Amino acid sequence: MLIDWFTVIAQLINFLVLVWLLKHFLYRPILNTIDAREKRIADELADADSKIAEAEQQREAFQQKNAEFDQQRTAQMNKVGEEAKAERTRLLEEVRQESDALRSKLKLALKNEQLSLKDSLSQRAREEVFAIVRKALSDLASTSLEASMADVFVKRLDALADAEKTSLQATFQESTEVLIVHTAFDLPKKQITQITKALHGLLGDGVVIEFATDANLISGIEIDSHGQKIGWSIADYLTTLTKRVNDVMLSHNAVQDESPELEKSQEQAS
């Protein structure tokens, strides 16, 4: 059998042309369509992955924000709780301090009132005692007691220090008025002579001396000239005693007044 090479070549060319035509007009559009579809699917998958990733990021961001919000809320609640606790403690401390201050004031006021009442009663008692003593001495005063007081007065003049004598001389020697000797009762002549002699010996014989009675004196003697006075009497002793007792009571009260302040300072320090 003879091979028709022309026919074979023609068939081969036809086959190649057919393959090229199929590839160009049939397979290529199909392949392009498949590629386009694959590309579209890939793009959609990529877009879906992107959206999923974005959603995941948003979810994580939301969770982070929620966590931060929870932390902030917890911190804020803790802060508010601490502030409320501190404020409660401050208010309680303020109330306690006010209560302590009020208690101290009431205690001090009560103590002061007690001291005031005690001082008032003590003062009244002292006044009554001294008044009774003064009245008793006034009732007991007599001419004989006055004579004894005159003897004591003369002895006191003789016992004066030089500086005191000089002061009395400067006081009474310059006076041109009569020197008056006051007594509660009329003195016997002996005591008058005794006092006159003592005063002349101290002030000089030129001093004019007169004697007078003064009911306000309690067993004592007082010398008066030109507004200048010296004297010695039981009343003077009572006055001095009263002053000393009052000074002692004032000092005692001052110490008691300092005691509440000291107690208050010690309580605050503790």
Swiss-Prot record:
The chain crosses the membrane at residues 2-22. It is a single-pass membrane protein. GO terms for molecular function: proton-transporting ATP synthase activity, rotational mechanism; proton-transporting ATPase activity, rotational mechanism. Signal peptide: none annotated. One of its GO terms (cellular component) is plasma membrane. It is found in: Cell inner membrane. It comes from the Bacteria. Keywords: ATP synthesis, Cell inner membrane, Cell membrane, CF(0), Hydrogen ion transport, Ion transport, Membrane, Transmembrane, Transmembrane helix, Transport. It holds the Pfam family ATP-synt_B. F(1)F(0) ATP synthase produces ATP from ADP in the presence of a proton or sodium gradient. F-type ATPases consist of two structural domains, F(1) containing the extramembraneous catalytic core and F(0) containing the membrane proton channel, linked together by a central stalk and a peripheral stalk. During catalysis, ATP synthesis in the catalytic domain of F(1) is coupled via a rotary mechanism of the central stalk subunits to proton translocation. Component of the F(0) channel, it forms part of the peripheral stalk, linking F(1) to F(0). NCBIfam families: alt_F1F0_F0_B (TIGR03321). F-type ATPases have 2 components, F(1) - the catalytic core - and F(0) - the membrane proton channel. F(1) has five subunits: alpha(3), beta(3), gamma(1), delta(1), epsilon(1). F(0) has three main subunits: a(1), b(2) and c(10-14). The alpha and beta chains form an alternating ring which encloses part of the gamma chain. F(1) is attached to F(0) by a central stalk formed by the gamma and epsilon chains, while a peripheral stalk is formed by the delta and b chains. Belongs to the ATPase B chain family. This is ATP synthase subunit b 1. The gene is atpF1.
